[in-house]
C-alpha cells in the first residue's frame, strides 16, 4: 500500500504584514487548503464584472473541484497568496508554472470593496519574489482589454512588459528579475504607503483615550492616572477634533470603544497591562485606524512579555491598524489645523520645524527636555517606546513628504533593519538634515523592550554606513541639540571657511584651535572688538564688523565668541547677529563665555524681534560645542554636493 503524498511544507517566511496605499495594514500569506470556505465567501461577494474580468466568464459559484484546485498548492510550481484583514480575504494572487519551467502564468482577483488600495501591486511583488526563489524568471498573463486596472498594475510595476493582442485578449510577458526601475517602483509604493500610515497617526480627525479610574477612586494611587494625564494634555493642547473618553469604570465615559459610535482615527491605550491585548482587539473590531499604547511592560518583561507584544502587533495589523508603543510617551503634532498633544508633556510644545523621534521612554523624555530647554520648536514628536510596529524608518518616510519638517532628529538605541534605514536616511538627507544620536554600543546590546535582532556589523561599520547615508552622526543628546539649533535657524554653511569675531584674543585662539581640529579653516579673525559705550554705540559697530565678514568671498560662516560686556544684553547681541545672518544668507553662531542673563537661556536658540520679523541665532556657552556643531553641518553640505553630483531624482 502506497503512502499518500506528503503535504507541501508551508513557507512561513513568505508571510508578511503589508501597508496598503491608504496607510492601513493587512496580512499577506500563502494560501492554505483550509481556506476553501474563505475563498468561497470571497467569490460570493464579488460583482459579476469582477468575476468576468478574472475568469473571462461569469461563475456565480465556484465548484468544490475548483475550490480545491485554487487552495491546494505545492508552493513551488503552483503558488498563491491571499491578503487578509480581520481574517477575511480581500485579495488573491497566484502563479502556475508552465511547461517551460522558467515561465509561470500569473493572475489576480481583488475584492470589489478594496480595489484601488494597491493590493495588485503588493501581490505581484511577493509572487515575483517567490517565483525567483523557485527558479522562475518570467511571468505571463492574459488580461481582457477592458480590465484597465489590472493592465495598469503591470504597466506601472517597472518591468519591461511586452504585450500583444490576440483573440480578444491582451497577452503580457516580462522578466521578473528586479530592474532599477522596478526597484524604484517598489520603493516608491512602500514610501507612499508608510508615509500615509504615519500621517494618519499624527493628523487624526478624532482621538479616544481608553483607561482611567473610577470617579470615586480618589488620589490614593498618587494623583492622576496615566489616561487622565493624556486626556488633559489633549484637551489643553487644543486638539481640533473630537476627543472621546473610554472608561468602563466611569458612567460619564463611553464603556467601550465600540460605544463611541463612529470610527476613531487614533486610540490611546492606557489600561493595566493585562487588559491591553483585549483592548487592542476591541479597537480592531471597532474599525479604529491606529493605536498608541502608553502602558509599559511586554518585551521588557522577558520571553512571555515578548510573545504578548508580538501578539499585539498581529492583532493590530490583522485589523488594519498601525501601532505605536508599547511604553510610548506619546506623539505631538503642532500643525495649527491639528494641534495634537497626545503625550505626557503637560503643555503643547512650541511650533517649529524640528521633527523628533526617540525609542525608549527614559531617553525620549531626556531628548525632549533637552531640546525644549534650548528653545527649539517642533513640527512633530514621536516616542516609539518598544517600537513593536512603528519605527524610525516609518517616521523618516513621513518626514520626507512633510512640509512642516525641515530638520530631522533621531535618538536611536537599536536599528532593526540597517539596510533599509540606510536607504531611507540617504533619501531623506538629500532634502533635509538628518541628525542621529546613537551610543557607540548601538547594535551590540538591545535596550529593554526592543524585540529586534542585533546587527552583526561592528560599530565601525555602522558608523561608516551612517556617514555614507549623509546622516549627521552625534553621540549625545546635547550634541544633537547643538547641531539642530543651527540647522533650524541658519542657512547651511557652503564650505569650511570661518570668520572669528571676538572681544578676547584668548577666546579667538581657542576657537581657531578648535576649528583646526574639526577641519575648518579660519580665514578671517577680528579679536579686538570694542563694544563699549552702550547699545547705541556698540551694536552698530558689531553690525558693521559682522556684515564685513559675512560679505567676504572667503568666508562661509561666522562665529562671535565673547566675554560679557556690561552695557550689552544677550538679547541685544542676538538681535544684531540674527539680522545680519538673514540679510546675507550665511550662518552666524554665538558663543558666550561667562555670560549670566536671567532673561535669556544663553545655551540655546536665541530669539529676537527684529525689523525683518522674528529671527533667531544659535547660542552656546562653549565655543568648542559651537565649532563641533558647525563642522558637522559642513561635512553634511560636502556630502550633499557629492550626492547631487551623481544623483538624478
Question: What residue ranges belong to the model's regions?
Answer:
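Catalytic-core regions of core metabolic enzymes
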Residues: 177, 181-649
Amino acid at each position: 500500500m502506497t503512502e499518500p503524498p506528503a503535504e507541501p511544507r508551508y513557507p512561513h517566511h513568505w508571510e508578511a504584514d503589508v501597508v496598503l496605499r491608504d496607510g492601513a495594514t493587512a496580512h499577506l500569506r500563502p494560501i492554505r487548503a483550509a481556506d476553501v470556505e474563505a475563498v468561497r465567501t470571497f467569490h460570493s461577494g464579488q460583482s459579476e464584472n469582477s468575476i468576468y474580468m478574472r475568469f473571462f466568464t461569469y461563475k456565480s459559484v465556484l465548484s468544490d473541484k475548483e475550490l480545491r484546485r485554487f487552495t491546494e498548492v505545492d508552493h513551488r510550481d503552483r503558488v498563491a497568496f491571499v491578503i487578509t484583514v480581520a481574517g477575511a480575504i480581500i485579495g488573491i494572487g497566484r502563479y502556475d508554472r508552465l511547461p517551460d519551467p522558467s515561465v509561470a502564468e500569473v493572475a489576480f482577483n481583488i475584492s470589489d470593496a478594496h480595489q484601488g488600495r494597491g493590493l495588485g501591486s503588493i501581490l505581484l511583488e511577493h509572487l515575483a519574489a517567490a517565483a525567483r526563489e523557485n527558479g522562475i524568471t518570467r511571468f505571463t498573463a492574459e488580461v481582457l482589454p477592458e480590465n484597465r486596472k489590472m493592465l495598469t498594475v503591470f504597466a506601472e510595476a517597472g518591468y519591461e512588459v511586452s504585450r500583444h493582442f490576440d483573440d480578444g485578449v491582451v497577452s503580457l510577458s516580462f522578466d521578473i528579475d528586479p530592474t532599477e526601475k522596478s526597484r524604484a517602483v517598489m520603493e516608491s509604493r512602500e514610501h507612499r504607503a508608510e508615509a500615509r500610515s504615519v500621517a494618519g497617526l499624527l493628523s487624526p480627525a478624532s482621538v479616544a483615550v481608553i483607561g482611567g479610574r473610577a470617579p470615586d477612586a480618589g488620589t490614593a494611587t498618587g494623583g492622576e492616572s496615566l489616561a487622565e494625564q493624556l486626556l488633559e494634555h489633549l484637551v489643553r493642547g487644543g486638539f481640533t477634533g473630537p476627543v472621546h473618553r473610554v472608561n468602563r469604570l466611569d458612567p460619564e465615559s463611553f464603556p467601550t470603544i465600540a460605544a463611541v459610535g463612529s470610527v476613531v482615527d487614533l486610540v490611546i491605550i492606557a489600561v493595566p497591562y493585562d487588559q491591553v491585548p483585549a483592548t487592542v482587539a476591541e479597537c480592531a473590531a471597532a474599525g479604529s485606524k491606529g493605536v498608541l499604547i502608553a502602558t509599559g511592560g511586554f518585551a521588557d518583561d522577558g520571553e512571555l512579555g515578548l510573545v504578548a507584544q508580538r501578539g499585539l502587533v498581529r492583532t493590530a495589523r490583522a485589523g488594519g491598524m498601525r501601532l505605536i508603543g508599547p511604553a510610548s510617551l506619546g506623539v505631538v503634532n503642532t500643525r495649527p489645523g491639528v494641534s495634537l498633544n497626545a503625550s505626557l508633556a503637560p503643555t503643547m510644545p512650541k511650533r517649529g520645524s524640528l521633527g523628533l523621534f526617540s525609542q525608549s521612554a527614559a531617553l525620549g523624555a531626556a531628548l525632549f527636555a533637552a531640546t525644549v530647554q534650548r528653545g527649539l520648536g517642533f513640527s512633530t514628536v514621536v516616542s516609539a517606546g518598544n517600537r513593536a510596529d512603528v519605527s524610525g524608518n516609518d517616521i523618516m518616510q513621513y518626514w520626507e513628504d512633510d512640509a512642516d519638517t525641515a530638520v530631522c532628529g533621531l535618538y536611536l538605541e537599536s536599528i532593526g533593519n540597517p539596510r533599509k534605514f540606510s536607504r531611507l536616511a540617504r533619501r531623506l538627507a538629500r532634502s533635509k538634515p538628518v541628525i542621529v544620536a546613537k551610543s557607540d554600543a548601538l547594535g551590540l546590546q538591545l535596550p529593554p523592550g526592543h524585540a529586534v535582532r542585533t546587527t552583526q556589523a561592528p560599530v565601525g561599520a555602522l558608523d561608516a554606513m551612517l556617514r555614507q547615508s549623509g546622516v549627521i552622526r552625534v553621540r549625545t543628546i546635547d550634541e544633537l541639540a547643538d547641531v539642530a539649533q543651527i540647522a533650524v535657524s541658519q542657512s547651511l554653511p557652503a564650505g569650511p571657511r570661518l570668520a572669528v569675531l571676538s572681544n578676547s584674543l584668548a577666546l579667538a585662539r581657542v576657537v581657531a584651535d578648535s576649528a583646526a581640529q574639526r577641519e575648518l579653516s579660519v580665514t578671517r579673525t577680528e579679536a579686538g572688538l570694542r563694544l563699549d559705550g552702550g547699545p547705541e554705540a556698540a551694536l552698530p559697530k558689531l553690525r558693521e564688523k559682522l556684515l564685513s565678514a559675512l560679505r567676504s568671498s572667503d568666508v562661509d560662516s561666522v562665529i562671535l565668541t565673547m566675554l560679557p560686556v556690561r552695557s550689552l544684553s544677550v538679547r541685544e547681541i542676538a538681535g544684531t547677529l540674527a539680522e545680519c545672518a538673514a540679510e546675507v544668507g550665511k550662518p552666524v553662531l554665538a558663543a558666550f563665555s561667562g555670560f549670566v542673563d536671567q532673561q535669556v537661556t544663553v545655551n540655546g536658540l536665541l530669539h529676537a524681534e527684529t525689523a525683518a520679523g522674528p529671527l533667531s541665532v544659535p547660542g552656546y556657552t562653549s565655543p568648542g560645542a559651537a565649532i563641533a556643531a558647525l563642522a558637522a553641518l559642513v561635512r553634511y553640505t560636502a556630502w550633499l554636493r557629492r550626492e547631487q553630483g551623481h544623483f538624478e531624482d
